[in-house]
Amino acid sequence: HYKKRKAQEKGLPEPTVTNEEYVEELKKGILDMGIKLLFSKVKSLLKKLKNKIFPKKKEDNQAVDTKSMEEPKVKAQPALRGVEPTEDSNIMNSINNVMDEIDFFEKELIENNNTPNVVPPTQSKKKNKNETVSGMDENFDNHPENYFKEEYYYDENDDMEVKVKKIGVTLKKFEPLKNGNVSETIKLIHLGNKDKKHIEAINNDIQIIKQELQAIYNELMNYTNGNKNIQQIFQQNILENDVLNQETEEEMEKQVEAITKQIEAEVDALAPKNKEEEEKEKEKEKEKEEKEKEEKEKEKEEKEKEEKEKEEKEEKEEEKK
């Protein structure tokens, strides 16, 4: 309807779109909306998780207010050469990098449909595509579910194809948090570019962070007076966007239902025209048959009249004789 109206305003011929094309475009729009909604939900969850792990102190807020806007930012990682970044800075950088990636892909989704061919700003250099990636192998594409519990060390220097796969697996790992299993949530946090020799240290860090997250989770569970159930408390403190998500899904369903009804109405609008044409043709045929019948009856009446007149004439002649 929008394209037709624009065409009429510009004096152009109205575009013709089939129902199949219309439904296909509708599906694409719903998928696009769902991806944007997922990005928004994940980003909000990461912000809340970061604020819980690294709460801002009042002194820090006051210090930030007194600083000039032009003052350079302090690096999260130590600048000394050979010094290993702290686990806090690793986690903070990991969350920030994921949020930057989400912002980038969200922007590319709006501005450019060829997102897989675009290099994100956090990717400073490319790796060899044939290089082995930790936690992934050649069967990943066919059986991603087997890698659900693997540790994925997200590297900003990964090849774009590998990075997209890791993002997909990372998004899947938000489901344990939604289900209340906070101990599994740590697996969605990447810990920077680590070599194999650091795996043992990373595992120790993971156990510590798991305990911290579990403590945060327990604190959230005891936040209210107990009048609300665990699921409501969890949603209010961590997953507030679930309500918005549900409302959006319901709204999307209503829109899809309305559009479906509109399509059916348009199809039905075409059907009555065919019925009217058929009825007109039937009426014409009926009128034709009635005319033919009337003509036959007239011919019959005329013949009968002629025969009657002939008989009367013959009777008169006989009487004269």
UniProtKB/Swiss-Prot annotation:
Residues 58-74, 273-321 have a biased composition (Basic and acidic residues). GO terms for cellular component: extracellular region; plasma membrane. Keywords: Cell membrane, Malaria, Membrane, Secreted. Transmembrane segments: none annotated. It is a peripheral membrane protein. Residues 58-88, 113-141, 263-321 are annotated as: Disordered. This is Merozoite surface protein 9. Not glycosylated. The keyword Oxidoreductase does not apply. Forms a complex composed of MSP1, MSP6, MSP7, MSP9 and MSP3; within the complex, MSP6 and MSP9 mediate the binding to the host erythrocyte. Interacts with MSP1 subunits p19 and p42; the interaction is direct. Interacts with host SLC4A1/Band 3 protein (via the 5ABC region). MSP1 subunits p19 or p42, and MSP9 form a co-ligand complex that interacts with host SLC4A1/Band 3 protein. Disulfide bonds: none annotated. Residues 113-122 have a biased composition (Low complexity). It is found in: Cell membrane; Parasitophorous vacuole lumen; Secreted. Belongs to the plasmodium ABRA family. It comes from the Eukaryota. It comes from Plasmodium falciparum (isolate FC27 / Papua New Guinea). During the asexual blood stage, involved in the sialic acid-independent (SAID) merozoite invasion of host erythrocytes by binding to host SLC4A1/Band 3 protein on the surface of the host erythrocyte. The lineage of its organism: Eukaryota, Sar, Alveolata, Apicomplexa, Aconoidasida.
